[in-house]
Amino acid sequence: GVRAKAVVMATGGWVNRHVVRDLPPAFTNAYAQFVHAPFLVANVALTNWQFLYKLGITAAIWDRGEGNFGYTCNIRIPMQVGGYRPPLDPSKPTVLSFYTPFFYPGEDIRAQAARGRAELLQTSFREYERQILGQMVKLFGASGFDPQRDVAGLILNRWGHAYSVPYPGFYGGSHGQAPRDIIRQ
């Protein structure tokens, strides 16, 4: 083990409560009350975005109904450094980012998080690629999107514990002690 007067753990609380042996019980209990939801960010490298320009958009949102992937996407603004301001030009390459939460209405929040993490990690790259490109054809095919011509690459960022889900009672806690306030001490 490591011995020190003070330790800074630069990991998530879901890890800290299992790794730090002498963590005060109040912290361990507070960390146990957090629920972390998974999230997928898919970055699609495009050779151009003329198909979006024809629609007059740089972003889209849609119903996450049956057969749909994700619920929103947007073009990443080119990086600006110092005085350098690259143009947002539809004939130039860009990245289109898709944001995908995992939720299952009617299920307990912890069960949703666990099920979402399992789906996130068990789904193959090829399956996500199929779903994403299929969604793009559905949304943008009529305006000229062609995956063979317009897609240069795809990167998946799988976040198993992306964000804390504030369930009912989370902010007030029990007996006025909210888990987030205990952790901040």
What are these model-derived regions, one by one?
Residues 2-64:
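Glycine-rich loop(s) and the adjacent beta-strand/alpha-helix scaffold that form part
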Residues 45, 51-185:
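Conserved flavin/dinucleotide-binding core of flavoenzymes
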